[in-house]
UniProtKB/Swiss-Prot annotation:
Subcellular location: Cytoplasm
GO molecular function, one term: nickel cation binding
Function: Required for maturation of urease via the functional incorporation of the urease nickel metallocenter.
Protein name as annotated: Urease accessory protein UreD
Segments traversing the membrane: none
Nucleotide-binding recorded as keyword: no
Keywords in alphabetical order: Chaperone, Cytoplasm, Nickel insertion
InterPro entries on file: UreD
GO cellular component annotations of the record: cytoplasm
Similarity comment: Belongs to the UreD family.
Subunit organization: UreD, UreF and UreG form a complex that acts as a GTP-hydrolysis-dependent molecular chaperone, activating the urease apoprotein by helping to assemble the nickel containing metallocenter of UreC. The UreE protein probably delivers the nickel.
Pfam family for this entry, one: UreD
Amino acid sequence: MTIVATATRPQRAEGRGHLAAKLLDGRTRIRELYQEGAAKIRLPNTFDASMEAVIINTAGGLTGGDRMDWSVVAGAGTKIDVTTQACEKIYKASAGVAEVTTRIEAGAGARVDWLPQETILFDRAALFRRLDVDLDESAEFLAVEAVLLGRKAMGETVDTGLFRDRWRIRRSGRLIHAEELRFSEGVAALSARQAVLGGQVAFATLLYAGPLAEAYLGRVRSLLEGAMGGASAWGDKLVVRLAAADGFTLRKILIPVISVLRNGAPVPKVWNL
């Protein structure tokens, strides 16, 4: 008897979630909601005119070959806060690259706050993340992306791997902001450079696009005193970059800055759980 071995493709996590909102009777309401695979969207009750969306990866993390796609469309006059249920963990990849793509559209007078909790990269993880945003001329947008190179309290380090983070932010079709971050191969050696992270293992980028950018700048800079970071504003755009020794230290700086850029509103409640 001849036994023929067949190659089995490893099971991969895939998901797609889509949320579109409209303004109805002065409140932000669901217009479309779609969930597929490991992607879930939950909408907690709110007590104002805004909508809070919590996106969930039911696979519990990502590894090479996994793919998640999210899209959010905020209709004219709506306000949506989008966050994650927990930190997204990117595990060691035996083959392939995990991909996460997020597309956001904000209509006239709309505001979208993209506030995922931290992404945790483990040693030999591989992730390519894309954020594509299209804003109306009068829309506001806030994005926060924080990354941890392992969990310092657990003794974890990231010596090698791949992390690509690509942002393209457009207003009325014209490009107003682009990010192209890449860590590959010797992650520990690269992040140790003074011009990169100076040996810190937690870092974040924040972008606010809206009419209050320059008005927020002074308050943001006062919060960054003594921290490894900086803020700049020009026109209707404010950018903040931060680095810290660990995730806890980063959060202590990050949360007050986010609150300023939300005009005093706190971070979503799931951040405190």
